[in-house]
Amino acid sequence: MLRRMNFSVFAVMTFAGLFGWLTVSGQLVDGFAQDTKSQPASTAATQLPMPDPAFKGRIGETYKDSTPSYPLPVKASKGSPNVLVILLDDVGFGMCSTFGGPVPTPHMDKLANNGLKYTRFHTTALCSPTRAALLAGRNHHSCGTGVIIEMGTGYPGYTGIIPKSTALVSEMLRDHGYATGMFGKWHNTPEPDISPAGPFDRWPTGLGFDYFYGFNQGETHQYYPTIYRNTSWVPQPKSPEQGYHFTADMTDEAIAWTRNIRAADPDKPWFNYFSTSGVHAPHHAPNEWREKLVGKFDHGWDKQRELTHATQIEMGIVPKGTMLTPRPKEISAWEDQPADAKKVYCRLMENYAAYMAYTDHEVGRLIESLRTSGELDNTLVMYVVGDNGASAEGGLEGTFSEIASLMGVQLGLESSLKRIDEIGGPTSEPHVPVGWAWAMDAPFQWTKQVASHFGGTRNPMVVHWPKGIQSKGQLRTQFHHVIDVVPTILEACKIPEPKTVNGIPQKPIEGTSMVYSFDNPKAKDRRTTQYFELATNRAIYHDGWVACSKYGLPWETAGRGDGFLKASWELYHVNEDFSQASNLAAKEPAKLKELQAKFLEEAKKYGVFPLDPRFSERMDPKLRIAGDPKTSWIYYGNSVWLPEPIGPQLFPRPHSIAAEIVMPKGGAEGVIVCAGAFSAGWSLYVKDGKPNFRYTFFDIADVTIAGSDNLPEGKVILKTEFTPDGTREGGGTLKMIVNGILAGEGKLKRSAFRHGLEPFEVGRDSITAVSPDYKTPFAFTGTIEKVAFELTKK
């Protein structure tokens, strides 16, 4: 009887569970007429993702007397606009023709003539911080991104890790029914996470983007990029000789993505974050675009600033009476440059400008595709013209290889002059000299990195949305910041700010919507306070005034010391002094003191402390490694591909490489292991039966060490041992050993812990060849059983 009763209860409970007869407490209810009410829309809409919809049908005993209610995906409100956020890179306020600059940008002009031009819009002065703030709607320190991700340290404002409490607009839009895609430069994934093992929650696809096509790091070679599709590396679709350039490639991808979204769902709005490489170094422009600008900058950087300033006043971009700030004493006058220097500097600037003009062309292609499809009218375009000011990181002379500069190597004017005809092409990695960067930031002081002055932080913006904005071709002068983009998008799309995302309470959005200014040019500013800070360059804007303190030079990225605590402060009444030209600190000490106190208040509020002037010193990967750093690595097989920072960090430390390979009958050839690129890198390979080790270092310390004999058939242990000589240049002796017998030896004059933009690989050299002895991919045709690396104590 007991068994029968238990079975009966079990049967009733099972049947009741199927049809919903029981409450949580176990009481029977009338499940055949249930209609559970969903949460109020206002609550559900602020909890992302939204809760599963309640069942609204009717369940009877059989399907014939039941009414289904299929759960549908969240849909955006009818008529919701598409959103296109375009972000350029390292573009100064005075570069583009749209804002009075010398570089022709007709597609940006066209968009602005049918939209709005914001001339008091601001960024953070550096890449990753601006990008995090742009997408999160919070200040860069609130997003853990007080510096670029490669410089993250263990403080909340500087981790280089966007917290889960600051969800991105991509997550908000996706969870409200938008398709989301990201194309181009990301630069917000912590460097240790950029690997096949992830974790992937900090990649674009883990932060709200359905689709990603681009690169994770701060820059890439435009002819030989390191591209990811979602979370997987993909080879470029064609070669530079076939016309390949990454800017065109990412544009093709973005156009195809929007067309496929529309083909699959005619009503689904999309969010496209289109973040170009242009015009971050290396500056790569197709030859036909360079040819268009030959001779355009022969007058030099001083004259160019004067011309730009005059055009800006004539166009109304800057108010009448705006002063042109003088050249800093640290930058030489154009007239003092030697003839050969002028020749090189003009070529570098022509190439830089051509890169901008070409980028405008590709952005225009994307815009025209939307015009053709009829989608442009209801697409909110927010076109941010630079993530910071123009870059002075090319140094006073510019450079043929900015990768060399990043590694602390100044190739000098002679190197650029020798290879002047290659500038802008696939064999170059060029960057303009400081003087041209300063000229492109007219009328302001300073450049990228300098968050204290508008040359680093004031980037113009174009807004275009025919269906949502009546005004056309007008200026907007309200003071705004990159954190204001997200609340603007949310208001335009009628989406509430989320309170929780994935169960995590959210920090309030710190930006202010700009929608109020769309059709009201005289609207009173709604952003009255904004702090700025980057590597101790700091400023505070409050009610039309700016107090600021600059420290260090942006092209000197090491050894800045701690003098920032004694650095002087300046004061500007920027409501009347557009260009920060008249320092009022001595005349208005009370106002300066008031603003200094305001900066401290904002800095404490948003996690700016501790201040840290170090720049290149913070690039040390050991600052971001938990536990003891690795001293040995083993990789198996013929196919390993890793970003170089994730692979073994060998040079200039003492180390050994031991490859266990099998040479088939008749021999084999190919790359066993390599890291880096054509300009700098190392490769251990077999050619014509003999082992070779190549170290390439910007044509100034290249060396190939070849083995004396052919490798024997069968199993071979091929080993290299490097012993540093203790010099600052990282030179040393490298021995090549085959099956325990010395087979070759040579000297490396220089070496470095990192070699640019290309990966570490076992079994091939996929992108550009480290050695001129072979062409990519030069895959090894024998068998690689394993390759072991060890840091030694010699």
Model-predicted segments: where are they?
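N-terminal secretory signal peptides that target proteins for export/translocation
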Residues: 1-7
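Bacterial N-terminal signal peptides
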Residues: 10-27
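Formylglycine-dependent sulfatase
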Residues: 17, 28-570, 578-597, 611, ...
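Acidic glycine-/aspartate-rich tracts in secreted/extracellular proteins
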Residues: 140, 576, 792-794
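Asp-box/BNR beta-propeller loop motif
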Residues: 575-579, 740-741
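Extended recognition patches within non-cytosolic domains
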Residues: 588, 592-603, 783-794
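Extracellular glycan-associated modules
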Residues: 610, 614-794
